[in-house]
C-alpha cells in the first residue's frame, strides 16, 4: 500500500500513543482535525486531507465518538524508524 510521507509521519505519532482530535459541524461532518502526540505536542503538517486519506485506507479508527487512533491495519502498515523509539 502506498503511504505518503505525511501519512507515515502521522501513523508514527499514533503508534507511539498519539490521538487525532476532530470537530464536527451541525450535519455531523468532520470539519477540523488535530493530531496530538502522547506528550501533548501538535503535529503541524497534519491536514484534513491527510486524515481523510488515512480513514479511507482504514489505517485509523474511532470507536463510540472517541478520538481517532491507529488501527491494527495501520500498525501493520507503518514502517519502522530508528529515531522513533518512544522515549
UniProtKB/Swiss-Prot annotation:
Source organism superkingdom: Bacteria
One matching Pfam family: YjhX_toxin
NCBIfam families recorded: PRK13687.1 (NF010240)
HAMAP family per UniProt: UPF0386 (MF_00827)
Family stated for the protein in its record: Belongs to the UPF0386 family.
The protein, known as: UPF0386 protein RSKD131_0371
Originating organism: Cereibacter sphaeroides (strain KD131 / KCTC 12085) (Rhodobacter sphaeroides)
